[in-house]
Amino acid sequence: MITALTALLVLISLGLIVTVPVALATPGEWENSKSDFTKGFQAWVALVLVIAAADGVASSL
């Protein structure tokens, strides 16, 4: 399970690495899609916390 969550984290990270600079470089794109990127950032942070919690539980067993 932790491996799948880590793979999802890597995919979200790669998506943000590619799309955020493109949105910032395109005139007006950041303002239009700012809420979508905010949701992506929130999902990334939440996934980091879930992976940390899952790893903590798995290592204590």
From Swiss-Prot:
<keyword id="KW-0934">Plastid</keyword>
<keyword id="KW-0602">Photosynthesis</keyword>
<comment type="subunit">
    <text>PSII is composed of 1 copy each of membrane proteins PsbA, PsbB, PsbC, PsbD, PsbE, PsbF, PsbH, PsbI, PsbJ, PsbK, PsbL, PsbM, PsbT, PsbX, PsbY, PsbZ, Psb30/Ycf12, at least 3 peripheral proteins of the oxygen-evolving complex and a large number of cofactors. It forms dimeric complexes.</text>
</comment>
<feature type="transmembrane region" description="Helical">
    <location>
        <begin position="5"/>
        <end position="25"/>
    </location>
</feature>
<dbReference type="GO" id="GO:0009535">
    <property type="term" value="C:chloroplast thylakoid membrane"/>
</dbReference>
<keyword id="KW-1133">Transmembrane helix</keyword>
<keyword id="KW-0793">Thylakoid</keyword>
<feature type="transmembrane region" description="Helical">
    <location>
        <begin position="38"/>
        <end position="58"/>
    </location>
</feature>
<dbReference type="InterPro" id="IPR002644">
    <property type="entry name" value="PSII_PsbZ"/>
</dbReference>
<comment type="similarity">
    <text>Belongs to the PsbZ family.</text>
</comment>
<keyword id="KW-0150">Chloroplast</keyword>
<dbReference type="GO" id="GO:0042549">
    <property type="term" value="P:photosystem II stabilization"/>
</dbReference>
<keyword id="KW-0472">Membrane</keyword>
<keyword id="KW-0812">Transmembrane</keyword>
<dbReference type="GO" id="GO:0015979">
    <property type="term" value="P:photosynthesis"/>
</dbReference>
<protein>
    <recommendedName>
        <fullName>Photosystem II reaction center protein Z</fullName>
    </recommendedName>
</protein>
<keyword id="KW-0674">Reaction center</keyword>
<dbReference type="GO" id="GO:0009539">
    <property type="term" value="C:photosystem II reaction center"/>
</dbReference>
<keyword id="KW-0604">Photosystem II</keyword>
<dbReference type="Pfam" id="PF01737">
    <property type="entry name" value="Ycf9"/>
</dbReference>
<dbReference type="InterPro" id="IPR036512">
    <property type="entry name" value="PSII_PsbZ_sf"/>
</dbReference>
<comment type="function">
    <text>May control the interaction of photosystem II (PSII) cores with the light-harvesting antenna, regulates electron flow through the 2 photosystem reaction centers. PSII is a light-driven water plastoquinone oxidoreductase, using light energy to abstract electrons from H(2)O, generating a proton gradient subsequently used for ATP formation.</text>
</comment>
